């Protein structure tokens, strides 16, 4: 792992999910209209896409994944997702997750209304996470949140309020784990949390009125 330290708004008008964007906690398996009760979708189509560099200014982090690791993602062997504490409360944590998908999970189609997404997500095997946690959060709590057993502290956020961690599962497949450990991470200036509370939109989304807007 290479580590160095350098100093959006969700649409309320539509529950539609665009291919290539992660599903927010508000959207996971949920549909507000009765007519959507039986709506189904393929979760693997909505994992985060590979990029040359990921810049999360509300987390105060940017990182680059290895080319081989990105190939695993492009081949749908690894799902990149996100998670954060409730957006209507004080931010306690926010992180990106990296998970192994089986062939069955890659092909799976789930029902939005019946908690299908949560069941699918919980069935994935966690490789590791990158994110921030409120200062003085115990490693025991971080382990519970991230589903990881090994935590490397990258540093402290620029506002001094959060600890930044790179977390992994020590017993995971060595080839995938070693590639994940090649991730290059930097701490950058952390922007103030947006009014809508969602901190997992990237730099390219910041000028838009909603995250992931095309």
Regions found by a protein language model. Give the residues of each.
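N-terminal, intrinsically disordered, polar/charged segments of Gram-positive cell-envelope systems
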Residues: 9-65, 198-213
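C-terminal motif of bacterial Sec signal peptides marking the signal peptidase cleavage site
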Residues: 4-7
């Amino acid at each position: 792992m290479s580590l160095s330290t350098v100093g959006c708004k969700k649409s309320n008008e539509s529950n539609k999910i665009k291919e290539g964007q992660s599903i927010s906690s508000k959207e996971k398996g949920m549909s507000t209209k009765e007519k959507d009760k039986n709506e189904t979708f393929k979760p693997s189509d909505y994992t985060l896409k590979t990029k040359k560099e990921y810049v999360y200014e509300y987390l105060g982090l940017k990182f680059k994944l290895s080319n081989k690791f990105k190939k695993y993602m492009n081949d749908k062997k690894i799902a990149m997702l996100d998670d954060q504490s409730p957006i209507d409360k004080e931010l306690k944590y926010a992180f990106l997750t990296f998970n192994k998908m089986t062939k069955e999970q890659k092909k799976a189609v789930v029902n939005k209304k019946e908690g299908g997404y949560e069941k699918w997500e919980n069935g994935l095997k966690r490789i590791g996470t990158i994110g921030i946690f409120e200062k003085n959060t115990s490693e025991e709590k971080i382990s519970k949140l991230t589903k990881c057993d090994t935590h490397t502290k990258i540093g402290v956020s620029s506002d001094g309020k959060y600890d930044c961690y790179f977390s992994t599962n020590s017993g995971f497949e060595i080839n995938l784990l070693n590639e994940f450990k090649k991730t290059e991470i930097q701490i950058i200036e952390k922007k103030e949390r947006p009014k809508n509370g969602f901190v997992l939109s990237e730099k390219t989304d910041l000028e838009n009125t909603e995250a992931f807007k095309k």
